[in-house]
């Protein structure tokens, strides 16, 4: 079995490298990751400069490459150039920091898994609480079990899994299938000036609404569950199709 691993934390991302080392005893693992951190870049791809591929490490069952691109670039290049065939599964992560609710729309981690789903490849995006112990082998055993289930059962077309792992030290209640919550922020921008007197802004902000629906990934992780959310990239609101047609919008 061949696994393609990527992330948005960069090729030195500890979570991804630890997972690669764990999986290499059972699978052929190829890592293709950004050469530097590309967090919150969503599904961006590189069109206006060349992509450069660098081999970082090569063993019998583990190869690591870095590219000067985005997480989605990594999946494309990994499939088309490095592997030259589709892997059995693509794993994006383990990301340092959770990817919950509508925050996934900004996530390079989740977008890399979406890119794999566009290719028709089973994919899992994995994120962990920043306080979670990256050395805890239970994290990797859980992911190994999940990978085996996905390879055995398959996933529906255009569907991937978004997994969020809380801090095991605080106690884990179990694994829970969830829906996406809503992450609503009050956006603020901190204004400052550079040494030449030109203004610039830092984006800040805070959560304005606390999600309370127990079915959601946000609440489930907060309560101590590993959250698995099935998501797909078809953003169509099908219930709106007939409504739009009924508007009878004229061209002239």
Curated annotation (Swiss-Prot):
A divalent metal cation binds at residues 8-9, 39, 95. One of its GO terms (molecular function) is metal ion binding. InterPro entries: SurE, SurE-like_Pase/nucleotidase, SurE-like_sf. Its EC number is 3.1.3.5. It comes from the Bacteria. It is an enzyme of class 3 (hydrolase). It is found in: Cytoplasm. Its cofactor is a divalent metal cation. The keyword Plastid does not apply. One of its GO terms (cellular component) is cytoplasm. It catalyses: a ribonucleoside 5'-phosphate + H2O = a ribonucleoside + phosphate. Keywords: Cytoplasm, Hydrolase, Metal-binding, Nucleotide-binding. Gene3D superfamilies: Survival protein SurE-like phosphatase/nucleotidase. Coiled coil: none annotated. Binds 1 divalent metal cation per subunit. The keyword Metal-binding applies. Nucleotidase that shows phosphatase activity on nucleoside 5'-monophosphates. Belongs to the SurE nucleotidase family. This is 5'-nucleotidase SurE. The lineage of its organism: Bacteria, Bacillati, Bacillota, Clostridia, Thermoanaerobacterales. The gene is surE.
